C-alpha cells in the first residue's frame, strides 16, 4: 500500500513574495509595493474626481 500514500511537504518561507528570474525576492517585494501604492493613489484621485462631479451634478 506504499504507492497509495500521500506525502505533504510544508516549506516555511519568511519572504512570501516570489522571485523573478535572477532578481531576489526583495526586488519583487518593492515592485509590488510600488504597484500597490500607484493603484491606491489612482483610486483616491478617481474617487475625488467622481465625488466632485457628483456634487456638481447634484447642485
From Swiss-Prot:
GO CC aspect terms: host cell membrane; membrane
This protein is called what?
A: Uncharacterized protein UL2
| Similarity comment: family membership | Belongs to the HHV-5 UL2 protein family.
Membrane topology label: Single-pass membrane protein
**Where is this chain's protein located in or outside the cell?**
Host membrane
Species whose genome carries this gene: Human cytomegalovirus (strain Merlin) (HHV-5)
Membrane-crossing segments per the record = 32-54
Q: Does the keyword Transmembrane apply?
A: yes
Name the major location.
Answer: host cell
Q: Does the keyword rRNA-binding apply?
A: no
